[in-house]
Curated annotation (Swiss-Prot):
Its main location: cytoplasm. By forming a complex with tryptophan-activated TRAP, and masking its RNA binding site, it inhibits TRAP's RNA binding ability, thereby abolishing TRAP regulation of gene expression, leading to antitermination and increased trp operon expression. AT acts by competing with messenger RNA for the RNA binding domain of TRAP. CXXCXGXG motif repeats lie at residues 12-19, 26-33. The keyword Repeat applies. InterPro entries: Anti-TRAP (IPR031538), HSP_DnaJ_Cys-rich_dom_sf (IPR036410). The keyword Cell cycle does not apply. CDD domains: anti-TRAP. It is found in: Cytoplasm. This is Tryptophan RNA-binding attenuator protein inhibitory protein.
Length: 53
């Protein structure tokens, strides 16, 4: 199974991948410039669940 990065995250619509707005971290994406998709959250949850054992 191949998962592309585009399947896991999308560009933040507020800062347009910049991660900041007028020098302050973007509140919508926490300064990352991207927002996880539903599939991204599912993968993150799976990894965290199995690494925290």
């Amino acid at each position: 199974m191949v998962i592309a990065t585009d399947d896991l995250e999308v560009a933040c619509p507020k800062c347009e991948r910049a991660g900041e707005i007028e020098g302050t971290p973007c509140p919508a994406c926490s300064g990352k410039g991207v927002i996880l998709t539903a599939q991204g959250y599912t993968l993150l949850d799976f990894i965290q669940k199995h690494l925290n054992k």
